[in-house]
Amino acid sequence: MAGLVKAKDYDWKDSNMELFGSSKDRQVKKESAMTEKCWEPVGRATSPFLMVWRVNQFTLEPVPSDEIGNFYNGDSYVICKATRSPGGDKLLYNVHFWIGKHSTADEYGTAAYKTVELDTFLDDAAVQHREVEGYESQLFKSYFDKLVILKVILKGGYASGFRHVKPDEYRPRLLRFCKEGKTTYMRQVAFSKQSVHSGDVFILDLGSRAYQFNGSKCSAFEKSSAAAFLQDLESKRNGRCNTSVLDEADTPQDVGVLHEFWTALPDVPVKELEPPKEVIKSLYKLSDSSGKLELTIVSEGSASKHDIKPDDVYIILTKEGLFVYIGKDCSVLEKRNALSNAHKFLQTCPNPFLPITVVTDEQAESFLKGIWDE
């Protein structure tokens, strides 16, 4: 088919996931999983790893190792992280799908479907997660020393990167470096003077010239991350890019404003991000005991482990994210519809972009620790 047309911001959140959960769906997933070439290295692995795939028109393609940690907001991705079990040789798997701000509903659906397919390939041993740009879970961010979020560079969202573009044809961009916990974010921000402030480090990339601006209140980690990026930029452009550093603290204001870092940026308004809305912790039950699948509220304001029964699926809404508990004795219908119902549930919530984590009874002990109100 022709290149996908990008939807407006986060239109994918209204997408339909009705295919999930049917008996045909499970059969198709299993058959597809056994023939998906992307899963072959996962099946062969005997030691911990981090693998990433990008959705390209309903299929996946591996992200090269030197690009892992770079995410384009016009795309969706599948991420598999394997760690060694404590005191054992068994591998533990976390499978995430990440949705860029400008990803289409088709790309989102493919990423979600492939995440469940990979879990099927691993005999349901993985913990499944949904991640949305700008709302990533702490677990997801912990995988990367540097997490890079870039805007779409070429029409259609399947970004090319600078190495395929002449320096003078490259679209100017403004990059922000910000440390959150142990991870340094590099995020492409609005191309405006009003995006720049003293608390972080910024790089103005003009193609043949690039400038690092160190805010007077930035951290040493942000400085070093930006410097490393700038050095890598020079290397990748084979000396075709001149770089320099502008320190706000050491530069007189009347001199600084004449620097190209400032003169090249337009002074246009920047849309402020809406602060997250208040989330009331709540517990819901997904059950087919009545003959049809129904989601009902169990409690609001708290979530007690004592309300959990092994023969149903439960959804726990918290400010950190949405957790889905798969009871060990739940029905096949309840289990297969857990992720799709979590997605539908969040569509009605004030914060529809919260991370989603789906855990089995066996996985719940570690992932739901600290969630319960006893």
Curated annotation (Swiss-Prot):
<keyword id="KW-0106">Calcium</keyword>
<feature type="repeat" description="Gelsolin-like 3">
    <location>
        <begin position="278"/>
        <end position="369"/>
    </location>
</feature>
<dbReference type="InterPro" id="IPR029006">
    <property type="entry name" value="ADF-H/Gelsolin-like_dom_sf"/>
</dbReference>
<dbReference type="GO" id="GO:0051015">
    <property type="term" value="F:actin filament binding"/>
</dbReference>
<dbReference type="GO" id="GO:0008154">
    <property type="term" value="P:actin polymerization or depolymerization"/>
</dbReference>
<dbReference type="Pfam" id="PF00626">
    <property type="entry name" value="Gelsolin"/>
</dbReference>
<dbReference type="InterPro" id="IPR007122">
    <property type="entry name" value="Villin/Gelsolin"/>
</dbReference>
<dbReference type="GO" id="GO:0005737">
    <property type="term" value="C:cytoplasm"/>
</dbReference>
<comment type="function">
    <text>Severin blocks the ends of F-actin and causes the fragmentation and depolymerization of actin filaments. This severin binds stably with actin both in a Ca(2+) dependent and a Ca(2+) independent manner.</text>
</comment>
<comment type="similarity">
    <text>Belongs to the villin/gelsolin family.</text>
</comment>
<feature type="repeat" description="Gelsolin-like 2">
    <location>
        <begin position="180"/>
        <end position="220"/>
    </location>
</feature>
<dbReference type="InterPro" id="IPR007123">
    <property type="entry name" value="Gelsolin-like_dom"/>
</dbReference>
<keyword id="KW-0117">Actin capping</keyword>
<feature type="repeat" description="Gelsolin-like 1">
    <location>
        <begin position="58"/>
        <end position="109"/>
    </location>
</feature>
<dbReference type="GO" id="GO:0015629">
    <property type="term" value="C:actin cytoskeleton"/>
</dbReference>
<keyword id="KW-0677">Repeat</keyword>
<keyword id="KW-0009">Actin-binding</keyword>
<dbReference type="GO" id="GO:0051693">
    <property type="term" value="P:actin filament capping"/>
</dbReference>
<protein>
    <recommendedName>
        <fullName>Severin</fullName>
    </recommendedName>
</protein>
